[in-house]
């Protein structure tokens, strides 16, 4: 279904709805393709950040492969993207492994014990090991794959001098929405820890978290780093598997004000979306999303003193029963009204892949703003989606 779209208002649409904008998506894809060419490396889409399969025909114009971390993602790669996945999982299950193999071109093991258990059943897959460089600049422990006690990867001191003959690659993921300067430092640690095994390998996967589509990303530095790496290790194929970079700033989540309540001088605009259900990273990271037409006011011990003296200041509250399903504060340039739209920017990556139906709250629709200015509804959700999960 396609309906006319007007850039200044969403009033004609039913909210809530995620809207991915085709022109912005193609802009990111074109840039990533250029980076892949200039760095002589393969860039593939990580489904953990973005998996809206009705957009895959667009992706196939720019990239050839994807990365999966489960049987469902591997099947999505083969059945909907049309190419076998580069698959990594923290732990493969016996009853799923053969199906994963059928859907994968590359298969990375998280541990030597998983390798020993499954490698003989891996068929024609190119096999790899995830390694842990014991270095990451990700400050939020929830997202730091190299934090002490991590369950991810094999450290250098636990690798044998001679790798098993069927291990063809290393997988190393230690970034999260990082710049090229961070990768420069990480690469130094990776080579210091693991380069003595590089002669035994055919490929290396530097994982995700490389936010090349962010405006301040230093692409020229990345190109220089890869030129140097290829000079040192000309036989190694290099793979990057970002997720956020593909969908970065490609569209909003549009919500509406359902009610406005006040307690102890704090006004909360209750919306028809939920932070915990539809924007979980906001609470998990946490981070404050950009709201169109509003200024975020830092929430600290002094904020309550500012409330009586700041006009049009609101908390934004979700429509679930979770007490903490709110974030604040935002100052608007006018007084909010019931029925008014509230637009959360950059809500396409790590949202639709992580949403849930807590409280039975209706999932936002998913739409695509096409290049011709029409809005196509890709998916709408209802009671049946909630009921079928509860079978």
Give short role names for the model-derived ranges:
Residues 41-203, 217, 232:
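Active-site-proximal beta-alpha core segment in soluble small-molecule metabolic enzymes
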Residues 12-33, 38-42, 50-52, 60-62:
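Conserved N-terminal beta1-alpha1 strand-loop-helix module at the mouth
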Residues 1-5:
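Intrinsic disorder/low-complexity segments
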Residues 191-245, 249:
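Acidic, glycine-rich loop-and-beta core segments that form the ion-binding/anion-interacting portion
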Residues 25, 48, 77, 129, ...:
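Conserved, mostly hydrophobic/aromatic
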Residues 242-391:
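Charged (often Lys/Glu-rich) extended helix/loop segments that serve as interaction or gating elements
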Residues 179-185, 213-222, 249-255, 259, ...:
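Short glycine/threonine-rich loop-to-helix capping motif typified by GTGT followed
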Residues 8-9:
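Short, positively charged and aromatic/hydrophobic N-terminal segments
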């Amino acid at each position: 279904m396609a309906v006319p779209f007007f850039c200044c208002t969403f009033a004609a649409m039913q909210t809530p709805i995620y809207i991915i904008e085709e022109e912005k998506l193609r802009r990111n894809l074109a840039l990533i393709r250029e980076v892949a060419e200039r760095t002589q490396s393969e860039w593939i889409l990580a489904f953990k950040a973005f998996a809206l399969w009705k957009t895959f025909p667009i992706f196939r114009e720019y990239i050839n492969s994807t990365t999966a971390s489960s049987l469902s993602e591997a099947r999505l790669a083969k059945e909907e993207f049309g190419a076998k996945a580069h698959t990594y999982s923290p732990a493969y299950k016996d009853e799923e492994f053969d199906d994963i193999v059928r859907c994968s071109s590359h298969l990375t093991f998280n541990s030597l014990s998983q390798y020993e258990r499954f490698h003989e059943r891996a068929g024609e897959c190119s096999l790899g090991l995830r390694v842990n460089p014991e270095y990451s600049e990700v400050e939020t422990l929830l997202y730091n794959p190299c934090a002490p006690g991590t369950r991810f990867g094999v450290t250098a001191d636990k690798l044998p001098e001679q790798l098993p003959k069927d291990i063809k690659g290393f997988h190393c993921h230690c970034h999260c929405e990082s710049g090229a300067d961070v990768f420069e430092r990480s690469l130094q640690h990776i080579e210091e820890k693991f380069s003595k095994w590089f002669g035994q390998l055919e490929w290396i996967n530097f994982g995700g978290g490389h936010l090349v589509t962010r405006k301040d990303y230093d692409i020229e530095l990345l190109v220089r780093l890869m030129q140097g790496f290829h000079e040192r290790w000309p036989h190694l194929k290099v793979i990057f598997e970002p997720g956020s970079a593909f969908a970065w700033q490609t569209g909003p989540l549009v919500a509406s004000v359902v009610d406005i309540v006040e307690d102890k001088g704090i006004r909360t605009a209750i919306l028809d979306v939920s932070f915990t259900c539809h924007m979980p990273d906001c609470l998990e990271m946490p981070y404050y999303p950009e709201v169109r037409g509003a200024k975020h006011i830092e929430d600290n011990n002094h904020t309550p003193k500012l409330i009586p003296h700041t006009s049009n200041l609101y908390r934004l509250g979700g429509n679930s029963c979770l007490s903490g399903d709110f974030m604040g504060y935002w100052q608007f340039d006018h007084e909010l009204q019931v029925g008014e739209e509230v637009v959360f920017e950059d809500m396409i990556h790590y949202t639709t892949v992580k949403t849930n139906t807590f409280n039975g709250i209706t999932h936002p629709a998913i739409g695509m703003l096409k290049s011709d200015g029409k809005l196509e509804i890709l998916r709408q959700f209802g009671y049946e989606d909630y009921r079928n999960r509860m079978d």
